[in-house]
A protein has these predicted regions:
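Conserved glycine-rich Rossmann-like NAD(P)H-binding loop of the short-chain dehydrogenase/reductase
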Residues: 26-42
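Active-site helix of classical SDR
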Residues: 116, 153
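C-terminal helical subdomain
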Residues: 179, 198-236
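The beta1-alpha1 cofactor-binding region of Rossmann-like NAD(H)/NADP(H)-dependent oxidoreductases
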Residues: 56-66, 98
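Conserved glycine-rich cofactor-binding loop
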Residues: 12-13
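Substrate-binding pocket helix/loop in short-chain dehydrogenase/reductase
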Residues: 92-93, 100-102
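Residue(s) in the substrate-gating loop at a strand-loop-helix junction
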Residues: 136
Length: 260
């Protein structure tokens, strides 16, 4: 399918914006969703004529439904839905408040759930589609303790994604479900974390947004269930869970992840 319609949340910056631009270069139709309207429209302008910006807060179910409605009204279909919106935190487990925990679940898990539940009936009616949930290496290995509730949220997102895949596997084999797990990416993720944090763009060895988005683009073209933004990350996860004491392998963390 060469003329895909791709919905990307969290598309005003970072991985989402970079993926939108790559998708535009492929000639695909792109629906970009985010809260920040000026930045979103700037990205849409770079994507080109086949871009549809939708200002929305994906932690609100009605806003997510509005994204789908806008996509269908403009393009008539959706082929790929990328749940990319998210936010980090810089607090230890012992410091978390109810509000902190709820915010991490709302932004990182509920937003993806709303996306899944909005687009899934459309995919089921067509018998095909692709849902991609952007998770994190921190959803597999707790390299950074101060990410606490963010790590927990990404673990929850991974479980939600895996369960959805099993739910659809037999009856809807052409609806693909992907967990995408990047490590440290050179975005404003760190400075935008709840409680602040180190600028991810200044961490040596951080993966560029262009490279990370390129891996995501390949996932869209060649759907797989579980994809890491760098191939060596999979071995790091295997090594962690193979350890009897669940010790993080020395020197095995993605670049910069041992730092807050």
């Amino acid at each position: 399918m060469d003329n895909k319609v791709v919905v990307i949340t969290g598309a005003s910056s970072g991985i989402g914006a970079a993926l939108a631009e790559l998708a535009g270069k492929k000639g695909w139709k792109v629906v970009l969703a985010a809260r920040r309207e000026p930045e979103l429209r700037q990205v849409a302008a770079r994507v080109g004529a086949e871009a549809l910006p939708v200002v929305a807060d994906v932690s609100r179910r009605e806003d997510v439904q509005r994204i789908l409605d806008a996509a269908l009204a403009r393009f008539g279909q959706v082929d790929v839905w990328v749940n990319n919106a998210g936010r980090g935190i810089s607090k230890l487990v012992s410091q978390l408040t109810d509000e902190d925990f709820d915010e991490m679940m709302r932004v990182n898990v509920k937003s993806a759930l709303y996306g899944i539940q909005a687009v899934l009936p459309h995919f089921q009616s067509r018998g095909r589609g692709h849902i991609i949930n952007v998770s994190s290496m921190l959803g597999r290995v707790p390299y950074v303790p101060v990410r606490s509730a963010y790590n927990a949220a990404k673990h929850a997102l991974n479980a939600l994604t895996a369960n959805l895949r099993q739910e659809l596997r037999e009856r809807y084999p052409d609806i693909h479900v992907t967990t995408f797990l990047p490590g440290v990416v050179a975005t404003d993720f760190g400075v935008n974390a709840l409680g602040g944090g180190m600028d991810s763009r200044k961490i040596p060895g951080a993966q560029s947004v262009e490279e990370t988005a390129g891996v995501l683009l390949d996932v869209i073209e060649r759907p797989r269930p579980d994809v890491y933004s760098r191939p060596e990350y999979r071995q790091q996860v295997i090594a962690y869970y193979a350890s009897e004491d669940l010790a993080i392998p020395e020197g095995g963390a993605p670049p910069g992840t041992r730092r807050p």
